[in-house]
Amino acid sequence: MSFEELWQKNPMLKPRIEKVVVNFGVGESGDRLTKGAQVIEELTGQKPIRTRAKQTNPSFGIRKKLPIGLKVTLRGKKAEEFLKNAFEAFQKEGKKLYDYSFDDYGNFSFGIHEHIDFPGQKYDPMIGIFGMDVCVTLERPGFRVKRRKRCRAKIPRRHRLTREEAIEFIEKTFGVKVERVLLEEEEETQ
């Protein structure tokens, strides 16, 4: 039985996107950080928060607690719309999504080198070019039991997402081809 048939038989097993976190690692504060904030707000439609340096590094001119990056957390429809555009920009760069980008619980990450690859974005010499990391967290309905305040419980192993299931969900939902490298190596060793 394929995952698609299983999801139709029991809709509580169908994965969904919990959140998408977009991270801009600018590496410096000041004017470049404010320009990055404009770009990320234009791409996501949400105001970013500033991430701060954890350590002082004099060779890079970074002091502890100095804002050096930006991040935005997207949920629901905004997350799905952004992810469609992000996959389009990712494939426009000629990159492929590999199965080793997925962890054992179905979460995955990928990077985009230039924000101008997004649909509707043009190069502006005053702003420059920014890259970003996109981290996607997947879950099933019922995962709230591990986060709620009262009667908190663990998610049983049978209800957790697997790497293969997450790959199939992304391929079916967004039409992205995932190159299988890890799965082929595991089959060869057995």
Swiss-Prot record:
Keyword Transmembrane helix appears in the UniProt entry: no
Concerning Pfam families, the annotation shows: Ribosomal_L5 (PF00281), Ribosomal_L5_C (PF00673)
Alphabetical keyword list: Ribonucleoprotein, Ribosomal protein, RNA-binding, rRNA-binding, tRNA-binding
| Gene3D superfamilies xref list | 3.30.1440.10
Provide the assembly information.
Part of the 50S ribosomal subunit; contacts the 5S rRNA and probably tRNA. Forms a bridge to the 30S subunit in the 70S ribosome.
Q: Give any GO molecular function from the UniProt entry.
A: structural constituent of ribosome
- Entry GO terms, CC: cytosolic large ribosomal subunit
Native source species: Methanocaldococcus jannaschii (strain ATCC 43067 / DSM 2661 / JAL-1 / JCM 10045 / NBRC 100440) (Methanococcus jannaschii)
Similarity comment text for this entry: Belongs to the universal ribosomal protein uL5 family.
- Matching SUPFAM superfamilies: RL5-like
Highest rank taxon of the organism: Archaea
Reply yes or no: does the keyword RNA-binding apply: yes
| Family matches, as PANTHER family | 60S RIBOSOMAL PROTEIN L11-RELATED
Q: Provide the protein name.
A: Large ribosomal subunit protein uL5
Looking up PROSITE patterns in the UniProt record yields: RIBOSOMAL_L5
Q: Which InterPro entries match?
A: Ribosomal_uL5 (IPR002132), Ribosomal_uL5_arc (IPR022804), Ribosomal_uL5_C (IPR031309), Ribosomal_uL5_CS (IPR020929), Ribosomal_uL5_dom_sf (IPR022803), Ribosomal_uL5_N (IPR031310)
> Tell me, what is an example of a GO biological process annotation in this record?
translation
Q: What does this protein do?
A: This is one of the proteins that bind and probably mediate the attachment of the 5S RNA into the large ribosomal subunit, where it forms part of the central protuberance. In the 70S ribosome it contacts protein S13 of the 30S subunit (bridge B1b), connecting the 2 subunits; this bridge is implicated in subunit movement. May contact the P site tRNA; the 5S rRNA and some of its associated proteins might help stabilize positioning of ribosome-bound tRNAs.
